[in-house]
A protein has these predicted regions:
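Flexible, glycine/charged-enriched surface loops at secondary-structure junctions
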Residues: 38-39, 125, 225-228
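Buried hydrophobic packing segments
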Residues: 25, 29, 109-116, 144, ...
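Active-site metal-coordination/substrate-binding segment of hydrolases
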Residues: 54-125, 130-136, 141-152, 187-190
């Protein structure tokens, strides 16, 4: 099958709901007699032996994540936990009807499965590493046992532009904070404040645009009120 056929698999795979897609990946490997492992976080590693003549080449890890951001239009009845995506293909473009596409990072998983399934490519030994819950904090990667991997060269397939390779990587940090809170009953008029209508955007690729952030604005608003 081609790359497009692999991508069109109708399996719900939102963050926190990756068991079904993870099990499909395991079944994919078993049907092709490929070595495979799956951990408690639903991370999957699929291994393909080197092509003839490439047995001594270093193992290459291909890595991507299988969860997606689940957003839909206001009038959509799509259930991300039960329904597959309604894909529309126009020429070279694939879109989803009324929902996010999941191209981040479904395209990486599709590429990896196409590579694993191909008998025409001449390649070194491949380890396809598919992690989970990337969109909500890299949770699958954090739970991964690195000893499962033999390769020392990793190609992350979760970038923004084709044809561009970035050497090294970006990192992340999670901070756990305990703030002392004293609650007291306050009498008087209550008011609900909503901040909406902002442009939104990607916190990584568009952070330099200095767009308004509702969390920051809410914090500033409360800070100013506290000083009144």
């Amino acid at each position: 099958r081609g790359l497009g056929d692999v991508y069109k698999r109708q399996i719900p795979h939102g963050s926190y709901h990756t068991k079904q897609i993870s099990d499909y990946l395991v079944q994919f490997a078993k049907e092709r007699n490929l070595e495979c492992s799956q951990d408690d976080s639903n991370n999957v590693v699929i291994r393909k032996a080197a092509s003839a003549g490439y047995e001594d080449a270093p193992v290459v890890i291909l890595q991507g994540h299988c969860d997606m951001v689940c957003e839909k239009t206001a009038d959509s009845t799509h259930d991300f936990e039960k329904d597959g995506l309604d894909l529309m293909i126009e020429g070279d473009y694939v879109t989803a009807n009324g929902t996010t596409l999941g191209g981040d990072d479904g395209i990486a998983v599709a590429y990896m499965l196409a590579v694993l399934e191909s008998d025409d490519l001449q390649l070194p030994a491949i380890e396809a590493l598919i992690t989970t819950d990337e969109e909500i904090g890299l949770l699958g990667a954090a739970a991964l046992n690195g000893n499962e991997l033999k390769g020392r060269t990793l190609l992350n397939m979760d970038s923004e532009e084709e044809g561009i390779l970035t050497v090294s990587c970006a990192g992340g940090m999670t901070a756990m904070m305990d703030l002392p809170v004293r609650r007291s009953e306050v009498m008087g008029e209550q008011m609900e404040v909503t901040i909406s209508g902002l442009a939104g955007g990607h916190s990584g690729t568009e952070i330099h645009k200095n767009r308004a952030n509702s969390n920051i604005l809410a914090g500033r608003f409360l800070y100013e009120l506290a000083g009144k």
